[in-house]
């Protein structure tokens, strides 16, 4: 019975774990905390989750297992009392452009079903409501007319078509019909009827004339069947002294003659040809070449190199073919190539960009001699599109793609579905309009939905499921998102909370959920909602194990495990375990000391004064409400606000992109704004984000920071290397010479397993050391180049203490809290937070101009209190060098140390997009409208 109450872990030694023994209570909310790199993830994901998954796999048949691949057994002696495990981490976010919030949560699937079952179809051309009726329903509608009403049953055989239509009239005559109505006038079929073939005609055969009275149902039904047969399921009824009526057996518009297919759930799927827009295939957008990117500085002339797109950069050279084309165009259309591009008339501009139908004579002198060619110029955009299509090189394709931008599909306007599907409505909204509402507005729409009795009966169960799932998203603080939002644009925290909401919807019991920092990107105000969700999962009867640094989560947990005491080699032990109160009393726990207030990140005594201002005027990207925002120069600024308030739109989409375009000459298109004043005060902008420092295992901290070049120089200067004639290139694992050729310097060899995942094994020749034997024989202070790459930052610091240039570079890695990572650690194994701090360290090691503006988005992701302390010191150091630092952040320990706060809000989504408060933390704390101010006031008061 005891095994059921605890997950008993014995001898866990995965990665840096030091054979730890730990009992984690079952069916409780447990937080694993500790310094970055201390071993939390190794315990939670690489041990508990991996073993749970492996045991599940073992329970499957060998046939099923061959499709799933084998899972390594974690390095642990035993785990008892382990329930099935489900991991909700940040890395498994789906970046597929077809994946949306709606598809991930499965709410969209329910909406597809709802629209297929109770949706009202309309004509996609004229918008008229169209319905399908059986003959019985048509008879009932007509019998409901006033008794003695005279009616004519008409079969519309020709609708709006030119011609004499002799065959149609002849066929009607042969079938025994007597009268016909042409363009509103009745004719006898026995008389000679001649129609003008150049005019569009409407022809309806008069099938029957009736008076509504009891007992004519049978005749009415028979006549209607004849009408429907003649007119492909359509019937017109002329009511004498009344309104004409139209009936359709199919979904077709009587006015436009457009029919729509049977409405099914797949009709609303943008991942299915039956529902997807035929132009963009359901993506909602297209990649198109953009003039602004191809000719970024239109104040330059063509002679000065205004056109920078590949294939046309040579047009400044008089001997090139592209120049010959432009010379011919200039001669034909009377313009010159030495004036600013922006000064061309609309006509000339259009010829250059979109081409001309007129043939021009191009004189070109090439290697084969001189010739004159008649060419119809297709325009820069079409020419580059053709080059892009025809090239076989992936590298050149990638280069071309930097000149393209994503634009909404011209057919569906970004709605992803074909027009027939978008013409189906529920409560006057089509499926795109509903999924484009914020979750908050969607909940309101669903609660106020008025349906007919039939619709209510059919849709009741579907709506119940939709409402429940929408509420789960609100409960995890995502009410500002919409279902149509692509998952690739979500932050790690948002994606994780969506998956959390989906899990609650599944209602599983007796499972161990393992989460990785679900509070990322969440404002303090919404933290309670998240904690409520985690507790709800626990109360259902699940074990919830959370890797977390958030103070509120630790205090709310039933049990906290502090892993440490340090990071990397110095971590991997259980320092303390118990409730938050018990941790506070434990002198060995650094976490406990921060929780109790014994250790704290100090509030600066003085706030720096701005040295100038950078002003963004008329920002209106996404939900920004045409606002003007002033960013102070030479200080540390925090941009705060609830999730979805517009922080990223302002800082990343507008400010960074605009500065990168002007200062760094980057090919970017900023978000919508009017102007930015004060750019001349800066010389460059650097975005220190959490994207990987490299996409391949060949990239590592040593190569990224540039210290590897210095280390290779050092090895090349040794007596051994000089004797053998080795230069620094010998010590690179990227080029032939010094690397192991069996694995091309990778240290691992990929074995393709066809329908199983590829298997990577250490190279048998170099044993994973990446270099050949001769290179490894060259030693510096008794260590080979491989040994140096295998050192942790801390070890390297001691090893290179007498080499100042190398020491300085490595010291900054140590200062940002990365003492535990190895110099040669593949970039693919680094977390987002670690990658960001490597970039920060690289910037700190550079000589400062004092005119740089640094932008960071949530740099505290994955950081413990002690690491946040180090981070704030690093950011302050950047500012002390005269630079400007702008940080998007929710962490109060960072916010309270800022010189200036810009608080966005007041709410997320449509309720945001304005500046609620700005000023020093003390000034913002006094603003009653600011949610951030309320929490800043509390934290400052607590620290004084």
Residue ranges of model-derived segments:
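Conserved phosphate-binding elements of NTP-dependent enzyme cores
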Residues: 1-944
């Amino acid at each position: 019975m005891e095994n059921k109450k605890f997950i008993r872990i014995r001898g866990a030694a995965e990665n840096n774990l030091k054979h730890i023994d730990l009992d984690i209570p079952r069916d409780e909310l447990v937080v694993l905390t500790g310094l970055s790199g201390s071993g939390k993830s190794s315990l939670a994901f690489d041990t508990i989750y991996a073993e749970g998954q492996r045991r599940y796999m073992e329970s499957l048949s060998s046939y099923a297992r061959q499709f799933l691949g084998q899972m390594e057994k974690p390095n642990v002696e035993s785990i008892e009392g382990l329930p099935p495990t489900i991991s909700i981490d940040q890395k498994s976010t789906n970046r597929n452009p077809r994946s949306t919030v709606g598809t991930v949560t499965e709410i969209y699937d329910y909406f597809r079903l709802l629209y297929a079952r109770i949706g009202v179809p309309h004509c996609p051309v004229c918008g008229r409501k169209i319905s399908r009726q059986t003959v019985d329903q048509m008879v009932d509608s007509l019998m409901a007319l006033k008794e003695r009403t005279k009616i004519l049953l008409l079969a519309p055989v020709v609708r709006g078509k030119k011609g004499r239509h002799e065959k149609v009239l002849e066929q009607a005559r042969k079938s025994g019909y007597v009268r016909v109505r042409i363009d509103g006038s009745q004719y006898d079929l026995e008389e000679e009827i001649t129609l003008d073939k150049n005019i569009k005609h409407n022809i309806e055969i008069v099938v029957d004339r009736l008076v509504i009275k009891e007992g004519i149902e049978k005749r009415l039904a028979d006549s209607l069947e004849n009408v429907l047969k003649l007119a492909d399921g359509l019937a017109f009824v002329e009511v004498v002294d009344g309104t004409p009526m139209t009936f359709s057996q199919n979904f077709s518009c009587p006015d436009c003659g457009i029919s729509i297919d049977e409405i099914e759930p797949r009709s609303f799927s943008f991942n299915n040809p039956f529902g997807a827009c035929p132009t963009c295939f359901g993506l909602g957008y297209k990649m198109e070449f953009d003039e602004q990117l191809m000719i970024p500085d239109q104040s330059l002339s063509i002679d000065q190199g205004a056109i920078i797109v590949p294939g046309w950069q040579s047009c400044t050279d008089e001997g090139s073919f592209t120049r010959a084309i432009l010379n011919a165009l200039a001669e034909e259309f009377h313009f010159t190539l030495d004036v600013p591009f922006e000064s061309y008339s609309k006509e000339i501009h259009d010829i250059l960009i979109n081409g001309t139908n007129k043939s021009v004579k191009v004189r070109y002198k090439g290697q084969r001699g001189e010739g004159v060619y008649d060419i119809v110029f297709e325009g820069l955009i079409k020419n580059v599109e053709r080059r892009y299509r025809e090239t076989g090189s992936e590298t050149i394709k990638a280069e071309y793609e930097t000149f393209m931008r994503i634009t909404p599909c011209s057919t569906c306007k970004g709605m992803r579905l074909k027009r027939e599907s978008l013409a189906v409505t529920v409560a006057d909204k089509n499926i795109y309009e509903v999924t484009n509402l914020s979750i908050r507005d969607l909940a309101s729409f669903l609660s106020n939905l008025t349906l007919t009795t039939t619709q209510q009966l059919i849709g009741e169960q579907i709506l119940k499921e939709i409402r429940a799932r929408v509420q789960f998203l609100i409960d995890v603080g995502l009410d500002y998102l919409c279902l149509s939002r692509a998952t690739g644009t979500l932050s790690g925290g948002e994606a994780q909370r969506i998956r959390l909401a989906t899990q609650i919807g599944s209602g599983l019991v007796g499972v161990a959920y393992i989460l990785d920092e679900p509070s990322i990107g969440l404002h303090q105000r919404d933290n309670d909602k998240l904690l409520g969700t985690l507790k709800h999962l626990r109360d259902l009867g699940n074990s919830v194990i959370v890797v977390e640094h958030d103070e509120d989560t630790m205090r709310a947990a039933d049990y906290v495990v502090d892993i440490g005491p340090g990071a990397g080699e110095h971590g991997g032990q259980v320092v303390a375990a118990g409730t938050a109160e018990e941790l506070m009393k434990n002198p060995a726990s650094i976490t406990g000391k921060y929780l109790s207030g014994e250790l704290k990140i100090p509030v600066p005594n003085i706030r720096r004064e701005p040295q100038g201002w950078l002003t963004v005027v008329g920002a209106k990207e996404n939900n920004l409400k045409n606002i003007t925002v002033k960013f102070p120069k030479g200080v540390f600024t925090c941009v705060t606000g609830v999730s979805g308030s517009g922080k990223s739109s302002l800082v990343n989409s507008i400010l960074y992109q605009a500065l990168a375009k002007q200062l760094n000459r980057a090919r970017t298109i900023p978000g919508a704004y009017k102007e930015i004043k004060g750019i001349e005060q800066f010389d460059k902008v650097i975005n220190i984000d959490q994207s990987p420092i490299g996409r391949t295992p060949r990239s590592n901290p040593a190569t990224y920071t540039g210290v590897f070049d210095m280390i290779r120089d050092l090895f090349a200067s040794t007596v051994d290397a000089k004797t053998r004639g080795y230069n620094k290139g010998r010590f690179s694992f990227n080029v032939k010479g010094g690397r192991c050729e069996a694995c091309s310097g990778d240290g691992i060899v990929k074995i393709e397993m066809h329908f199983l995942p590829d298997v990577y094994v250490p190279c048998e020749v170099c044993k994973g050391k990446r270099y050949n034997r001769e290179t490894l024989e060259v030693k510096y202070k008794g260590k080979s180049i491989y040994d140096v790459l295998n050192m942790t930052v801390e070890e390297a610091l001691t090893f290179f203490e007498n080499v100042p240039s190398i020491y300085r570079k490595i010291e900054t890695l140590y200062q940002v809290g990365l003492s535990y990572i190895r110099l040669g650690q593949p970039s693919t194994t680094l977390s987002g937070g670690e990658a960001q701090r490597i970039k920060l360290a690289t910037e700190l090691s550079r000589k400062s101009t004092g005119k740089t503006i640094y932008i960071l988005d949530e740099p505290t992701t994955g950081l413990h209190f002690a690491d946040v302390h180090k981070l704030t010191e690093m950011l302050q150091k950047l500012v002390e060098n005269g630079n400007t630092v702008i940080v998007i952040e929710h962490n109060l320990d960072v916010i309270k140390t800022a010189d200036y706060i810009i608080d966005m809000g007041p709410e997320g989504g449509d309720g945001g997009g304005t500046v609620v408060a700005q000023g020093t933390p003390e000034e913002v704390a006094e603003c009653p409208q600011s949610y951030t101010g309320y929490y800043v006031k509390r934290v400052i008061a607590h620290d004084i």
